[in-house]
Amino acid sequence: MPINIDYFSDDKYQYSTALMFAYINLCKPNKTKLNVDDLKFNLDYNCWANNVRPIDVLNDMKNKKYKDELTRIKNANIKYPIILDSNYKILDGYHRYVKHIIENKKTINVYIFDKKLMKKFIIGKRHEINTLEINDFIELFNRRFKKILLKYE
């Protein structure tokens, strides 16, 4: 039975955020500190349910239709870095990013994944229905990160 695992998609592929988190937890990549303003272009993406953009929420925070997103922003734990691709597109962490803006933070900790690393997180083409099960994700991670895993044996 397929499981519901979050993913990010671009115009070609779906990328597993679960694999990204596993990579972060195991490999402890370096964090980078960026200016919050460097990521503002991300506010215009339809990244949330019902085609809601972060900029819509920021511009109309009293609107009841944004209640769920505002709750998620309020509850977001900003101690965790957000995840970016090499173009600074947010892959995971929109709510944490918006919380930084609301709290007038000037900098944000991020992980930046280059194109080579991003290939390891691909789980399918953009418009394919994902039928992967938990064991499939474990197998993918083991296969794609075998060299790293060998260091821990």
Show the residue positions of the predicted features.
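Short loop/turn hinge sites at secondary-structure boundaries
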Residues: 76, 104-105
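Short alpha-helix boundary/capping and kink motifs at helix termini
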Residues: 37-89
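Short hydrophobic/aromatic-enriched beta-strand-loop microsegments
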Residues: 106-113
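Glycine-rich short-loop/terminal segments
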Residues: 1-55
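Beta-hairpin (beta-strand-turn-beta-strand) motif
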Residues: 87, 113-115
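A sequence-level detector for short glycine-anchored, His/Arg-bearing signature motifs
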Residues: 87-103
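Amphipathic, charge-rich alpha-helical segments that serve as recognition/docking helices
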Residues: 115-153
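Short, hydrophobic/aromatic-rich beta-strand segments within well-structured domains
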Residues: 83, 98-100, 109
